């Protein structure tokens, strides 16, 4: 058969041909020329590859690169601590700080331990050495600087009776505490020069000072490197810094090393009784709830004080954590609660937050932190404190926020977050509210107006099914409704799979997130991307639509509008700023949606399009096979039917011909391609798009749409979402992935990861149908691998241990010696079986306490916490005979208890029924912290600064409730520094599996009790 060499008569080609008698050939198949040589083309007609066209290559590459370019830095910021400087900054000695931390953490030092007394004396010596060096530096200073006035208070007088606990109508817990705080006051250049605290009833004058706090006690099972050793050495370095020449504070600075934070914030409460507590108006609290890493800004009282943290060299944190406290999602507390809630100070809480598995365990030591972590907290403390003591305004000198509080003024609620650990944003919550309301109102109006204009111009292809030609009344299909419901279906299915995976992990291997949170993230992300891509490709295959992006962004805008409404309500009614990221998410989505609507102005009006289409015959065939196997009418150079000339460029089929023909090929990603698709794919471009503007089988009017605007849309949405959602997702994971050992259900953790995975990847939805198969296929393999791993892997390791909680209880009435471990079933029973002394004992386990935790007990090795004394003399008490007293309401009975314990300074009294009131002679009372409430007291905790103290406790109760007082006296021992003092604990540490961490269950490691 003779081949035609006239390019106007050829159909089988790699690019479409132009008509009007000109040979505008892009690239002809050389097989159509007898000599095998294709005609040469001018450079003006040669097809070019568009680097930003909305085609598979650019979409896949650009989207992937943007995600990688932002996610990788986020991961690096989250996991790598900025390096400490090689040389010491002025006024700071990092080597000295590290040596101090090593000494501080060389043993357990809870309040109820002899090591605690040693640390107390050592800290006083260190403060003295620092001040001596400071005075010498001022003497040697060539500028003739004068050393500041510095006062050191070894507070051995402050004590307090107060109450804690008690929810609703439940009885409360009474507390008597004797403080052992160390307070250093550096007089500011503008401070009153009088020692007003020496005068009875003396009050400070002038502007309020600044308080920096850290606690030097640890828990009985942790060395306290980050909880709160780094905070303590930071305070020591702050003393050094602000007493150095050139660094003297303008406002007075109080540095508090408090003792007793781990036991219900007792040290901070004792500080409230010191005269200097009336002087400070702002504060910085340094804490730790992890072991190493970055010190995060955990929470703040207001916008104004938060701005001083902005000068930190490496800021880190989000208001999301602060709102977690407000909503009760975070149950642990720090001294921040006392400074803000009792004293009325305004300030910040900076703390280490991960890994929680090391918190309150023997891995909270110097081996698991670094000098980089020390510098991260110290540098933030220096920058923040320097700003506060240099501030001369009156912002923090206003009316008191409450009765009995200092005159610190009232701040505004704030929004704050870091960006890549290098910059910090802070603004008022009211500003967020105003922006939110503006966006909620303006954005829909703008789109509505644009929609009206498009309709007036007859270019509103969205939601259009067909267009009627006015002259002939003929209806021409515009297929503008295609893809309308595609996105919500795909979103629900893909996201629903993640929720299903969350339930699957929570059921099969709930603790895998404890050690392998990144594997869980990888599984969630890869699953969502692959499923969304797969469903989008199927939808695009059967019903291709050029309006896919516009409809997707419209749906996203609608969803984000609803979320922004909810967030705005919480901002207005509850002062919750955690949804701040929704504002940026919504704004980016609106701009992307706006571009999709503006693109429609480039289209011909629908009536004109209908007239043009009515001049051409209908497309050949109505099913998908006609698209695949034959060119359609709009592909013909003249719009004619498929006739004999169609196959003029292909040899007549023979027995040796390919079944599919030379111009069709089946692929995984694009199913069956036509010849022109195949050729363009092989050359890296999709020429049907670059030449005619129509991609594949999308609507023919889409040829007029710009091909580059998708890049703008992606850049408006993608980077903003990645920065905010990625950071918050990592932050939440660090804070929550290891809470299962504390009795918190882990399903909420998996649901949170699933939700943040969806939020993180939603920006890909409008473009993912253009992805090549390579990335989704790779992610499918990642999903399969991580799913298998997450379901089958053992969830704990030596680096990510399971925390169990120890206590040994000795009942002197029955002689029963019981060792107990509280932990997650079935692991806690596996651990007990590894203990030699428990292997032959009858193990009794209580019913489930919370989220799978159980308390299992067995007769254990006898404790040796008191030397050379029989067990029945370890505690002693006596109770006076009750006496009655008439009141206006009911008769009241009184009794006096004398309680003492050997080699301890902590006991408590438990009552079978709540008592009405109690008091201790010589103890201070504070109306800001009532010592009793109407529901009564069920327990009194007693803490003394001296060993083997005798507490005198007066109690009273209603005579109609009980004639006699019944309860138990319990004394506590918490010193595990000496091997052999608690053999049961020593044995557990020796024989427990390496993936087990031991923490305290109660105030004491050993608790000995006797009834009365």
From Swiss-Prot:
Glycosylation sites: 159, 842, 878
Any one GO biological process: proteolysis
InterPro entries attached to this UniProt entry: Fxna-like_M28_dom, M28_fam, Peptidase_M28, PFF1_C, PFF1_TM
Transmembrane segments: 61-81, 433-453, 488-508, 519-539, 551-571, 576-596, 711-731, 744-764, 778-798
Side of membrane Cytoplasmic, spans: 1-60, 454-487, 540-550, 597-710, 765-777
Renumbered residue ranges of the record's region Disordered: 614-660
List of residues binding Zn(2+) 2: 227, 262, 360
Record-level Gene Ontology MF annotations: metal ion binding; metalloexopeptidase activity
Entry's Gene Ontology cellular component terms: vacuolar membrane
Protein name according to UniProt: Vacuolar membrane protease
Species: Coccidioides posadasii (strain RMSCC 757 / Silveira) (Valley fever fungus)
Taxonomic path: Eukaryota, Fungi, Dikarya, Ascomycota, Pezizomycotina
């Amino acid at each position: 058969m003779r081949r035609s060499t006239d390019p106007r008569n050829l159909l089988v080609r790699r690019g479409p041909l132009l008509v009007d008698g000109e040979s505008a050939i892009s690239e002809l198949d050389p097989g159509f020329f007898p000599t095998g040589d294709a005609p040469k083309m001018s450079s003006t007609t040669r097809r070019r590859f568009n680097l930003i066209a909305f085609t598979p290559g650019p979409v896949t590459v650009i989207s992937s690169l943007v995600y990688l370019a932002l996610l990788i830095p986020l991961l690096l910021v989250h996991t790598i601590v900025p390096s400490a400087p090689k040389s010491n900054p002025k006024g700071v000695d990092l080597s000295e700080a590290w040596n101090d931390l090593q000494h501080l953490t060389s043993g357990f030092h809870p309040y109820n331990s002899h090591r605690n007394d040693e640390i107390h004396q050592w800290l006083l010596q260190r403060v003295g050495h620092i001040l001596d060096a400071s005075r010498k530096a001022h003497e040697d200073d060539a500028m003739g600087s004068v050393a500041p006035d510095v006062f050191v208070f070894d507070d051995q007088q402050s004590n307090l009776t107060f109450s804690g606990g008690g929810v609703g109508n439940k009885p409360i817990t009474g507390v008597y505490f004797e403080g052992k705080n160390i307070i250093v006051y550096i007089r500011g250049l503008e401070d009153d020069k009088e020692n007003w605290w020496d005068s009875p009833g003396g009050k400070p004058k002038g502007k309020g000072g600044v308080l920096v706090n850290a606690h030097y006690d640890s828990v009985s099972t942790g060395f306290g490197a980050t909880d709160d050793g780094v905070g303590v050495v930071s305070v020591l370095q702050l003393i050094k810094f602000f007493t150095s020449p050139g660094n003297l504070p303008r406002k007075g600075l109080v540095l508090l090393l408090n003792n007793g934070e781990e036991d219900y914030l007792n040290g901070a409460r004792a500080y409230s009784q010191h005269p200097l507590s009336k002087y400070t108006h702002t504060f910085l609290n340094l804490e730790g709830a992890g072991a190493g890493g970055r010190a995060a800004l955990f929470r703040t009282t207001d916008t104004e004080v938060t701005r001083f943290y902005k000068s930190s060299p490496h800021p880190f944190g989000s208001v999301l954590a602060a709102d977690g406290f407000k909503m009760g999602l975070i149950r642990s507390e720090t001294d921040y609660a006392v400074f803000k809630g009792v004293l009325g100070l305004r300030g910040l809480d900076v703390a280490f937050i991960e890994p929680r598995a090391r918190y309150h365990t023997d891995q909270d030591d110097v081996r698991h932190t670094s000098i980089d972590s020390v510098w991260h907290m110290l540098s933030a403390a220096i920058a923040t404190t320097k700003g506060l003591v240099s501030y001369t305004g009156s912002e923090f000198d206003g009316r008191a926020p409450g009765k009995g509080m200092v005159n610190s003024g009232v701040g505004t609620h704030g929004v704050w977050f870091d960006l890549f650990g290098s910059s910090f944003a802070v603004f008022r919550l009211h500003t967020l509210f105003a922006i939110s309301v503006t966006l909620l109102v303006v954005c829909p109006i703008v789109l509505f107006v644009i929609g009206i204009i498009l309709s007036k111009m007859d270019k509103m292809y969205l939601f259009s099914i067909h267009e009627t030609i006015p002259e002939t009344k003929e209806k021409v299909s515009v297929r503008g409704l295609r893809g309308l419901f595609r996105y919500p279906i795909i979103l629900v299915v893909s996201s629903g799979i993640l929720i299903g995976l969350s339930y699957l992990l929570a059921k099969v291997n709930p603790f895998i997130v404890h050690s392998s949170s990144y594997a869980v993230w990888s599984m969630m992300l890869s699953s969502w991307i692959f499923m969304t891509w797969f469903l989008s490709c199927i939808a695009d295959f059967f019903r291709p639509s050029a309006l896919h992006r516009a409809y997707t962004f419209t749906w996203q805008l609608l969803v984000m509008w609803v979320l922004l409404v909810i967030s705005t309500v919480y901002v207005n009614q509850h002062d919750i700023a955690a949804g701040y990221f929704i504002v940026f998410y919504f704004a980016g989505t609106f701009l992307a949606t706006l571009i999709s609507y503006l693109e429609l102005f480039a289209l011909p009006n629908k009536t004109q399009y209908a007239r043009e289409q009515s001049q051409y015959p209908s497309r050949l065939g109505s099913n998908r096979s006609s698209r695949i196997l034959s060119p359609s009418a709009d592909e013909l150079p003249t719009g004619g039917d498929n006739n004999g000339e169609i196959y003029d460029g292909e040899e007549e089929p023979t027995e040796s011909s390919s079944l599919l023909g030379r111009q069709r090929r089946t692929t995984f990603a694009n199913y069956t391609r036509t010849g022109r698709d195949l050729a363009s794919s092989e050359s890296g471009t999709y020429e049907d798009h670059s030449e005619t503007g129509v991609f594949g089988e999308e609507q023919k009017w889409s040829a007029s749409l710009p091909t580059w605007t998708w890049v703008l849309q992606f850049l408006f949405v993608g980077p903003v979402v990645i920065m905010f959602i990625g950071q918050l997702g990592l932050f939440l994971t660090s804070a929550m992935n290891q809470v299962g050992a504390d009795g918190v259900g882990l399903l909420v953790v998996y649901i949170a990861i699933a939700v943040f995975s969806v939020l993180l990847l939603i920006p890909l939805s409008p473009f993912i149908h253009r992805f090549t198969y390579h990335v989704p296929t790779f992610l499918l393999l990642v999903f399969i691998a991580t799913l298998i791993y997450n379901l089958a892997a053992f969830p704990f390791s030596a680096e990510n241990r399971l925390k169990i909680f120890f206590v040994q209880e000795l009942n002197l009435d029955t002689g029963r010696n019981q060792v107990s471990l509280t932990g997650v079933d079935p692991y806690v029973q596996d651990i007990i079986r590894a203990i030699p002394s428990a292997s032959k004992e009858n193990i009794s386990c209580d019913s489930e306490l919370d989220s799978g935790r159980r308390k299992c007990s067995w007769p254990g090795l006898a404790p040796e916490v008191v030397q050379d004394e029989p067990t029945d003399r370890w505690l002693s008490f006596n109770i006076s005979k009750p006496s009655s007293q008439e009141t206006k309401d009911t008769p009241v009975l009184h009794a006096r208890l004398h309680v003492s314990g050997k080699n301890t300074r902590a006991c408590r009294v438990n009552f079978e029924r709540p008592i009405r009131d109690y008091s201790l002679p010589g103890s201070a009372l504070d109306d800001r912290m009532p010592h009793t409430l109407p529901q009564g007291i069920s327990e009194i905790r007693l803490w003394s600064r001296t060993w083997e103290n005798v507490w005198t406790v007066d109690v009273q109760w209603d005579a109609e409730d009980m004639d006699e007082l019944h309860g138990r006296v319990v004394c506590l021992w918490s010193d595990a520094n000496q091997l052999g003092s608690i053999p049961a604990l020593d044995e557990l540490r020796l024989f427990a599996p390496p993936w087990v961490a031991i923490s305290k269950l109660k105030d004491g490691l050993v608790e000995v009790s006797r009834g009365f």
